[in-house]
Amino acid sequence: MITMDLMSGYGRVDEQVAIQEAAAAGLRGMEHLILQLSQTGTSERSPAPAPAQEQQQQQQVDCREITDMTVSKFKKVISMLNRTGHARFRRGPVVAQSSGPAASEPAPVRSSPSAVSRPMTLDFTKAASGYGKDAGFSVSGISAASSSFLSSVTGDGSVSNGRGGGSSSLMLPPPPATSCGKPPLSSAAAAMSAGVGHKRKCHDHAHSENIAGGKYGSTGGRCHCSKRRKHRVKRTIRVPAISSKVADIPADDFSWRKYGQKPIKGSPFPRGYYKCSTLRGCPARKHVERDPADPSMLIVTYEGEHRHTPSAAGQDHPPAPPPPLALPLA
């Protein structure tokens, strides 16, 4: 080691001396060139005979040669400076070999037939119960042309080569406790979720309440829930009108209560909306309108199904008891 250090020291000294000599030669050439150019400029200002002109041409040729030589010297300096600092190496500490037979024999390397690149994937194999060591994930590496390497990073901080061999310990910092939990909702998100719940709650009465609370309704507030209606079975019939009044409609097997009406585009007659009042909570509806082509006919459209029979009217509203009989006085 001492011999190598001395040789390397002598080599560095030789390099520095060579660089200094090349730089000095370049500077001397530049100084000579400047003097030659100054003499040439002085001779050009004063008129000279023919022999003097030949001397000036010779001086120009000498200037070109000096310039080329100076440039070559500086190029040599640059190349020597570029070579310094390279091709150096250090010897690392000698690693003590293990006496175990498993460590002396290297694990076989499986070669892949072609270069197949696999994307990086994260596989969360364990449930995150304690936000700490139980949260495990594996990272799949990119397989090269000669060998494939699979590194798995487990939650306890050990890095293995994926083939069941020895593993080198790598302690990883535990993740923060808030990384696996849900972030707190902002006020806007909370208001939005509350609005969704309100829409879901009052969707069932959207059809009836929108009409009753609208322009022709009796209530003052309008429901702000979704206007989407459920798919209902519709049945349309045509019956003759019993009078010219809009409120007079033909009777059927059920009792109906009017809860709203609205005008029809292109028709002078409005459309009336009725709900079944035979039994409380019955979803059956109907709307009645006059036929624009024949005002003496009514178009009745039924929606929904009754949840009772026509005889339920008497059960929901029992008849009043008969008045007591008057007994004759004796």
Swiss-Prot record:
Residues 318-330 have a biased composition (Pro residues). A motif (Nuclear localization signal) lies at residues 74-81. InterPro entries: WRKY_dom, WRKY_dom_sf, WRKY_plant, Zn-cluster-dom. Residues 51-60, 101-117 have a biased composition (Low complexity). Highly expressed in aleurone cells. In seeds, predominantly present in the plumule, radicle and scutellum of the embryo. GO terms for molecular function: DNA-binding transcription factor activity; sequence-specific DNA binding. Keywords: DNA-binding, Nucleus, Transcription, Transcription regulation. This is WRKY transcription factor WRKY51. The gene is WRKY51.
